[in-house]
Amino acid sequence: MPPVPRQTPVGSSRRFAHLSLRLLLLLIGMFTAALGVALTTVADLGTTPISTVPYVFTVLTGYSFGTTTFFVNIFLVAGQVLLLRRRFSLWNLLQIPTVLIFGICIDLAMAIVSPHAPAGWWTGLLMSISGNFVLAFGIVMQIRSKTIVQPGEGFVLAAAAVTRKSFGSIKIVNDVTLSLIAAGIGFVCAGELIGVREGTVLSAVLVGLFAKLIVKFVDRLGVFVQAGAAAIQEPQPPQPHESAITAIQTSEETNDQLTDERSSVQNRQ
């Protein structure tokens, strides 16, 4: 049996630096996403579908938006455990401290944005659209960090894996369900809709659209960067520290990755 190669100090420091950069990208992405949520919420046209339930509890109980976001997401982590059972990895429990940080980011973002509430419907619409773009940008950064998914996305991924449906289809069902739950709680407890309005529908459409546009731009930018790097050195295989810390992949996503890899190989040839 060949001897196992020892990890050199240079290799260890490189792995640590790479992981640190990914975690930094995750943190920046979380605050950016929180800022997007704050913008759409303060616009007063309805918050994002994933934030409707926490926002209703914030209005009804007086707890901060970040606090209710944390507790609602704890239930989403529990939902992943129920859906995946033995397939649930303990690594996915890292979503709990991650969403705690995200909740703090939301409270900070709300404190920054709240004093700048729009005066009319049109300015509110502009703020809502801007918030959706900022939110999409934050989501893309979190995904590109290849670290830890938020419980909201983790729950959808788990449901997609169990039902063998596409992520997009389950995401739509999840958003509609959360919005209906928030609307029901608002009607029962306050006799009116709370946080669910035209802006909620707008967010359901625009966030995904903006995210696709941002990804295309980033990918095109990456092509130029990779082309320059390829001219200097041969492409290297992915390193272990470049893999995701937590990941629940559906069969569709796996096939997409294989297709991307084949296309990359063909382009190099």
Where are these regions (language model features)?
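Core subunits and conserved enzymes of cellular information-processing
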Residues: 1-252, 256, 260
